[in-house]
């Protein structure tokens, strides 16, 4: 899980989700998991 100021989808499978006002990216590739700071 990377915590970043700006999250961007890395590949086609990355999905942007908003949970409790926090932008998250989930993906099959666990290295692509991100959360906005």
Swiss-Prot record:
<dbReference type="GO" id="GO:0005737">
    <property type="term" value="C:cytoplasm"/>
</dbReference>
<dbReference type="InterPro" id="IPR000473">
    <property type="entry name" value="Ribosomal_bL36"/>
</dbReference>
<dbReference type="GO" id="GO:0006412">
    <property type="term" value="P:translation"/>
</dbReference>
<dbReference type="GO" id="GO:1990904">
    <property type="term" value="C:ribonucleoprotein complex"/>
</dbReference>
<dbReference type="InterPro" id="IPR035977">
    <property type="entry name" value="Ribosomal_bL36_sp"/>
</dbReference>
<comment type="similarity">
    <text>Belongs to the bacterial ribosomal protein bL36 family.</text>
</comment>
<protein>
    <recommendedName>
        <fullName>Large ribosomal subunit protein bL36</fullName>
    </recommendedName>
</protein>
<dbReference type="Pfam" id="PF00444">
    <property type="entry name" value="Ribosomal_L36"/>
</dbReference>
<keyword id="KW-0689">Ribosomal protein</keyword>
<dbReference type="GO" id="GO:0003735">
    <property type="term" value="F:structural constituent of ribosome"/>
</dbReference>
<dbReference type="GO" id="GO:0005840">
    <property type="term" value="C:ribosome"/>
</dbReference>
<keyword id="KW-0687">Ribonucleoprotein</keyword>
């Amino acid at each position: 899980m990377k915590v970043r100021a700006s999250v961007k989808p890395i590949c086609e499978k990355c999905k942007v989700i908003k949970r409790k006002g926090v932008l998250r990216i989930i993906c099959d590739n666990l290295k692509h998991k991100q959360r906005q700071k």
